[in-house]
Design a protein with these regions (language model features):
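Active-site rim helix/loop that mediates acceptor-substrate recognition in acyltransferases
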Residues: 44-68, 72-82
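Acyl-donor (CoA/ACP) binding surface of acyl/acetyltransferases
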Residues: 1-40, 54, 74-208
Length: 208
């Protein structure tokens, strides 16, 4: 595992990934105000008070394993192909929230060497390959910098868009499981799916 690295700023061809901080709270509120963004998570927009709670949870999780946490993604020119990553977030376009916390859910392993990959993009940036681009950077960070043994990702089985990102970055399907929900969303009867990337898979993909 990495030693005292902190959570670094990351950069891709089109995106600047800045570690989540309290100054980003209003952007989280804006993101979660769109019910379509949360269709497969909450099935509705979230209130400001709900975002207060999730922001606090994210900030706490970001400190549990050095180098892991949450990033706010910023871009330029609508995230179009060929658009450059901004030099800094000042004046840049907010694209979404990228996630790589330690695994922590009820249906996830209690193992600090396992991280969970996630992504939540503002709707105007969908279908441009930005979630895939950011996910590749987070996987590289997880294995090459932090030293994780495994990265998992979970979503509703019917969420074909999210599953497509997982498959496009080389993750493999592991299982379908059926959590018990108090207020199940449409499509939840098909269950949740889990994908993974192991260190061995990552090494093989890099040809080393």
């Amino acid at each position: 595992m990495g030693d005292g690295m902190g959570q670094p700023t990351l950069r891709t061809e089109r995106l600047l990934l800045v570690p989540l901080d309290d100054c980003h709270f209003e952007l989280e509120v804006e993101l979660d105000a769109d019910p379509e963004v949360l269709r497969y998570l909450w099935g509705r927009a979230r209130t400001r008070d709900e975002v207060v709670g999730s922001h606090a949870d994210r900030m706490a999780l970001a400190g549990k394993v050095d180098g892991l946490g949450y990033w706010m993604a910023f871009g330029t020119d609508g995230g179009r192909r060929g658009s450059p990553a901004p030099e800094d977030e000042t004046g840049a376009e907010f694209v979404g929230l990228m996630m790589l916390p330690p695994a922590h859910g009820e249906d996830q392993p209690d193992d600090p060497t396992v991280a969970e990959l996630g992504y939540r993009l503002a709707r105007r940036y969908w279908r441009q390959g930005l979630a895939t681009e950011a996910s590749r950077a987070l996987l590289r960070h997880a294995f090459d910098t932090v030293g994780q043994s495994r990265v998992i990702a979970q979503t509703m089985a019917v969420n074909t868009g999210s599953r497509g990102v997982m498959e496009s970055v080389g993750m493999r399907y592991v299982r379908t499981f059926h959590p018990l929900w108090d207020d199940p969303l449409p499509g939840s009867e098909a269950g949740e799916v889990e994908y993974e990337m192991t260190r061995a898979m990552w090494t093989a993909r890099r040809g080393t």
